[in-house]
């Protein structure tokens, strides 16, 4: 029974992912958000490496210590809900900043910060979706699948935390140069 549920969840996730990735989609163009976010790291491979590659090492290490369980996922869901609300608040603050009267670099930083915040919302929603699916399936025996899913959850969580630091730094620069 659990194998059928797992297969259905994987198939549903893949179909959903494929429906969100088409280029120039008027529904939700996640691809362009990801491309714009990764352009922020253009010319600075060390920051890209630190924010997106190093967390792989951390997540592999954490999975060896402990896979996700019901308690971890419940706490993560609470934190993610708070973060999503916070990111929407940050978006409203960024929208209120008038970047048109500023110089080009200020406007570029404002746009990049806005894009990074949207990227964070998407990561949090993805993490929340994965977390809910694992909770609904409710199988927490140490299997290869649980280790892989735990690694993905830990990886995305670390990436979210590191990107929060990027957003904080950018918002500070925006307000210092106001």
Language model features with spans:
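Amphipathic, membrane-active segments
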Residues: 106-138
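Alpha-helical transmembrane segments of integral membrane proteins, especially early/N-terminal helices
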Residues: 6-12, 36-55, 78-87, 116-126
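Hydrophobic alpha-helical transmembrane segments
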Residues: 1-8, 72-80, 143-156
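Alpha-helical membrane-embedded segments
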Residues: 9-17, 150-169
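Cytosolic/matrix-facing juxtamembrane and C-terminal tails of multi-pass cellular membrane proteins
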Residues: 169-178
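Transmembrane alpha-helix detector for multi-pass membrane proteins
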Residues: 65-100
């Amino acid at each position: 029974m659990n194998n059928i549920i797992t297969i259905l969840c994987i198939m549903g996730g893949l179909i959903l992912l494929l429906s969100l990735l088409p280029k120039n989609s008027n529904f939700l163009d996640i691809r362009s958000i990801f491309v714009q976010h990764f352009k922020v790291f253009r010319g600075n491979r060390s920051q890209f490496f630190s924010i997106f590659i190093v967390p792989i090492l951390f997540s592999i290490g954490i999975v060896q210590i402990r896979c996700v369980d019901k308690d971890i996922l419940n706490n993560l869901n609470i934190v993610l809900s708070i973060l999503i609300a916070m990111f929407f608040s940050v978006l409203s603050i960024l929208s209120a900043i008038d970047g048109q009267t500023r110089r080009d670099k200020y406007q570029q930083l404002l746009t990049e910060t806005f894009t990074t915040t949207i990227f964070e919302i998407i990561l949090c929603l993805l993490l929340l979706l994965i977390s809910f699916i694992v909770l609904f399936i409710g199988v927490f025996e140490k299997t290869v699948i649980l280790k892989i899913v735990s690694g993905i959850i830990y990886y995305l969580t670390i990436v979210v935390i590191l990107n929060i630091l990027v957003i904080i730094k950018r918002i500070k620069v925006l307000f210092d140069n106001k």
